[in-house]
């Protein structure tokens, strides 16, 4: 009984106490007490394993709670960016109506500026945050593949990135980002960054004679799915302008303007370029959150599977521990009964 009290009061020294207690017992008691000592030793080990499993289960539950929070945030962001995309399309319609008025009297044979040399400026939209699956890898591979198909030599490519996470994937493809912009999700920050990007594109055109500007970004399809997309920003599409010129005005009132045609045209084109950049970023952000939502759904499923495994292990081990305790009680009862006899 003295040996048992020592064992129960200090589980960390279970084996040591049991061993020396066993050596100090009379030879006649060895066989009987050895069984009890082994029982207490294994019970102590079982308790340690149970505590470890319980900590693992608690950690998995905390991780599951975090994943659920991120899923909720991603869903809210997808909805918000979707509403912004709808508003931007209305804004684009207003720009088109303005251009429609300006280009009505421009002759169809009017010349459009053509690229002076085979140089390309690429704007690649990535993410600032992680945990969004293969979002950045997909757009990086898509951009490089399309630039190769355009047959633009690597030395004639100038790449600008939005989002730090995509840079490493571009470098893995053997390219370098000369211009890098970081951005935040709030509206004022996005507007400021887009103005800086537009200014940099104008510098490309004026100083480096880069007249071909292409945007690469992921755009949402439905739910948590998206696809990579390429938009040729410059030079402006001649057929698009001719289509606007031939388009029938919806209202009976004939529109007009008072300011200089060239100034108005330049202002509208700048608004169109800004809109295209802004829309690309918003659709990229919506796609990023769609990718993050899909990643969190997979993570939640994996966590739930892991939790089920841990719970089964915990319950089985707990049942084994209870069985051992019951067996010890039965053994003790039998020993006392035999002693009385």
Task: Identify the function of each model-found stretch.
Residues 1-15:
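Extreme N-terminal basic, low-complexity initiation segments
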């Amino acid at each position: 009984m003295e040996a048992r009290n020592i064992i129960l009061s200090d589980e960390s020294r279970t084996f040591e106490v049991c061993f020396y207690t066993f050596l100090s017992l009379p030879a006649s008691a060895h066989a009987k007490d050895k069984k009890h000592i082994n029982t207490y030793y294994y019970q102590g080990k079982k308790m340690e394993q149970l505590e470890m499993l319980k900590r693992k289960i608690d950690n998995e539950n905390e991780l599951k709670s975090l994943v659920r929070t991120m899923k909720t945030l991603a869903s809210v962001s997808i909805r918000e960016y979707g509403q912004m995309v709808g508003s931007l399309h209305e804004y684009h319609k207003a720009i088109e109506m303005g251009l429609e008025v300006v280009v009505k009297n421009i002759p169809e044979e009017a010349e459009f500026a053509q690229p002076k040399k085979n140089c390309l400026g690429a704007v690649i939209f990535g993410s600032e945050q992680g945990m969004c699956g293969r979002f950045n890898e997909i757009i990086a591979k898509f951009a490089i593949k399309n630039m190769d198909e355009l047959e633009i030599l690597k030395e004639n490519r100038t790449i600008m990135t939005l989002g730090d996470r995509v840079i490493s994937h571009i470098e893995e493809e053997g390219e370098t980002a000369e211009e890098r912009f970081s951005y935040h999700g709030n509206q004022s920050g996005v507007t400021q960054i887009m103005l800086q990007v537009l200014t940099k594109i104008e510098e490309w055109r004026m100083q480096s004679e880069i007249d071909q500007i292409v945007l690469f970004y992921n755009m949402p399809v439905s739910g948590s799915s998206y696809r990579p997309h390429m938009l040729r920003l410059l030079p402006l599409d001649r057929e698009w302008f001719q289509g606007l010129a031939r388009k029938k005005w919806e209202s009976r009132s004939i529109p007009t303007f008072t300011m200089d045609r060239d100034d108005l045209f330049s202002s509208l084109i700048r608004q169109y370029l800004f809109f295209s950049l802004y829309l690309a970023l918003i659709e990229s952000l919506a796609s990023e959150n769609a990718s993050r939502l899909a990643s969190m759904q997979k993570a939640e499923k994996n966590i739930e599977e892991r939790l089920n495994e841990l719970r089964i292990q915990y319950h089985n081990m707990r049942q084994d521990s209870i069985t051992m305790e019951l067996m010890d009680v039965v053994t003790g009862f039998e020993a006392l009964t035999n002693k009385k006899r």
